[in-house]
Design a protein with these regions (language model features):
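Cys/His-clustered metal-coordination modules, chiefly Zn-binding fingers
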Residues: 99-168
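Amphipathic alpha-helical membrane/lipid-surface binding segments
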Residues: 4-119, 123
Length: 168
């Protein structure tokens, strides 16, 4: 594996660690909602920075990616309604960041009906950013790129576009 591939694999592992720690802290709390999620995400970031899983700067970047993915997961689940319960069933998704996000979604239930407009708008993913598994759609040519696990957003294989929307 080349150094660049090793770095990407390490970042994907760090992202999954952050997602799993966030999941653990959020589900351990009594409150459900966006504010509780933000607190759990910040605590997960602080903990993993303290134990040297990543630098403060790397952790901040991963935290932003996870927050974006969480917003997208919630928005997508709200759009799908009942179908989301089946599609985002944690036992169906296996391990990794997407499974952690799905578990949080399952336990949160209707709390997110009052989310801010941010989660209702389309969230843009850019080449090079970290994200969980899902289907990215190129904004330039509508080509679909399927990510089977956490990783970096690649350029579009059809048109080399760098901006995507995401579904699951």
């Amino acid at each position: 594996m080349e150094k660049n591939d090793q770095d990407k694999a390490k970042r994907a592992r760090q992202y999954d660690l952050l997602a799993n720690k966030f999941n653990e802290l959020y589900l351990a709390g009594k409150e459900r909602g966006r504010e509780s999620m933000s607190v759990a995400l910040e605590k997960a970031h602080e903990h993993l920075t303290e134990v040297k899983e990543f630098s403060e700067e790397q952790g901040e970047e991963l935290k932003q990616y996870l927050s974006r993915d969480l917003d997208q997961t919630i928005a997508h689940a709200q759009h799908l309604g009942e179908e989301a319960k089946e599609r985002f069933n944690p036992s169906r998704l296996g391990a990794g960041a997407l499974s952690s996000l799905a578990t949080v979604l399952e336990f949160t239930g209707n709390t997110f009906r009052s989310l801010s407009d941010k989660t209702k708008q389309t969230i843009t993913y850019k080449t090079g950013e970290m994200t969980s598994a899902g289907t990215l759609t190129c904004q330039a040519c509508s080509q679909k790129v399927h990510l089977k696990h956490t990783g970096h957003v690649p350029p579009c294989p059809k048109c080399s576009g760098i901006l995507f929307t995401k579904g699951y």
